[in-house]
């Protein structure tokens, strides 16, 4: 489908507001937690991907206008976080190798913007000529039945990749392999939201 036909479909679906008095600036739109649910578009992947591309570009342009915050602390010295962008089922956009996604990954830290890409398989992070694994410093690998030692080695876990691959295949709910710049790789258990709410209710 040509871009114009996809845009025509989006107009027909009335995705965007016509009355400018009912719209808000993008930075105001992003105030707080914002979830863009694409399931309402049904099986129309072309329109979904076009909408994601539009949102990524607007997010990037907004990021460039963000005031750079000073570092926090001295030892360690950490970057202040302004916002996080989470893309679920990210393989649907990584395959298109959008230049704006690469820019967000490479430039985001400078502006205190983090990008979280969630996908079912590690092989999704190598798309065509773009290797999305390179700019990603932190990984949470949940149960992946067919994960290989080679895939984990590509994340910098070469020391015991074979053993870790076998453990990843058998992980339970909320368990994952955690890897970051200051962690060579360890297995941890996440804190489910329902447990957090239960703990708050008991206080």
Locate the predicted segments by residue.
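Conserved ATP-driven motor cores of ASCE-family P-loop NTPases powering translocation/secretion/packaging/pilus
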Residues: 102-188
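P-loop NTPase motor domains
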Residues: 1-113, 126, 167-184
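Charge-patterned, long linear interaction tracts outside catalytic cores
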Residues: 185-203
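Alpha-helix capping and helix-coil boundary motifs
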Residues: 44, 160, 200-203
